[in-house]
Amino acid sequence: MLDVITKTNKSELILGGQKSGKSRRAEFLARDWLLQSPDHKAILIATAQPWDEEMQQRIARHQRDRAERVPGLTTVEEPLQLSQTLNRLSRPDTLLVVDCLTLWLTNLLMPMIGENTINSPSNQHLAGYFTDYAAMLSIAISKSAGPVVIVSNEIGLGVIPMGHEVRAFVDALGKLNQDIAQVCNKVTLMAAGLPLSLK
């Protein structure tokens, strides 16, 4: 399952559904990076926000599991300013893991739901809003001094529920995944804990 992150294969987008093994693969890549050299560091940039009690419990569980599986992995919480954080933490000896783009996009979307911006089918602000953030993130990944692993959900394979909000989110995430796949050296689709190499 494990591929080695090297200087020639320095960025990877990991896609998959819920409980497909996306985060586990990212953790294994981080652990392998740490084992390659005592000088190596690994930082996980967590985008989740504790919106409710269930999410709080989920975040706490992920933190415990990561601490057991990858003891040397440092966690930085950043729900919004993802490209700026990548730029700030980027170093040749440091692997950066972003987990995940889906929650990051949700965080960007939440204020717009409150303003009813997303509910207007004719409003073009939404597409431009996400395009700017995706462009900045793509640049940060391509210019990173060290390796970067990006985790994101693939949610467009099943039946899409009714509602403009849901369809707009699925479209935005699908476009974001395409943009990030273009700049990553490697793209992996996870299913049942097994990797399928797409790029």
Give short role names for the model-derived ranges.
Residues 40-43, 94, 147, 186:
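Residues at the starts of beta-strands that form the adenosine-phosphate
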Residues 4, 8-90:
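Conserved P-loop
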